[in-house]
UniProtKB/Swiss-Prot annotation:
Keywords: Cytoplasm, DNA-binding, Transcription, Transcription regulation
Predominant location: cytoplasm
A single MF term (Gene Ontology): DNA binding
Organism name: Chlorobium luteolum (strain DSM 273 / BCRC 81028 / 2530)
Name the UniProt record assigns to this protein: Probable transcriptional regulatory protein Plut_1643
Amino acid sequence: MSGHSKWATIKRKKAVTDQKRGSLFTKLVKEITIAAKMGGGDPSGNPRLRLAIDTARSNSMPMDNIQRAVKKGTGELEGVIYDEITYEGYGPAGIALIIETATDNRNRTVADLRHIMSRNNGSLGESGSVSWMFQRKGSLEVPVSAASEEALMEALLEAGLEDLSNDGGETYTVITDVRDLEAAKKALEEQAIAFENAKMDLIPENYIELEAEDARKVIKLIDALEENDDVQAVYSNMEISESAMNSLED
């Protein structure tokens, strides 16, 4: 999972910029609204909504905003109806991309994505063209200061732990089956071990390792996609080499 951890490091740094763009709250509101629409407005009985609310709160979204988003999802307040659509394609150096969107206008979204991809040496593919390369997993991150690797293993062994990795950075990356993410969160809470960025993730079966030049191109494309208000998440099978990581962090 080393590639996942390295890319996670880049994404954590990008998140600060994303929030400044004002796009983060838009994406979080959409996720809360969709989760409430699909599974009801009670987070205790709706794991997706509970996760969305936890993510919003960890990013300092006011409770009023969260509650309005929930009520729009349940129909208590009038709101936009979003469709969830997943697109697949390729970026520079043959990197596989999965783009999850929430949109009120499918034609606008696909036109925007085609434009972004074509301007950044990428292309959209057919449904199923790259999704077979990925598996849906639960993931979360634990600061290395919060627990030792041994303590994490012990806490999570009976809570669905599938993979635990650290690339020498400031966090451990924990991977679980999607059905075990809540159990993993609960296990860490019971041991008073701090964690962050708990989410459903798409993990590639295999990675393509890139050097700095190609990695920059892929990151530029992913940045452009994530700036689009309809895009909720972008996943890739990019792994960044050690030398490229050092170059990108300079």
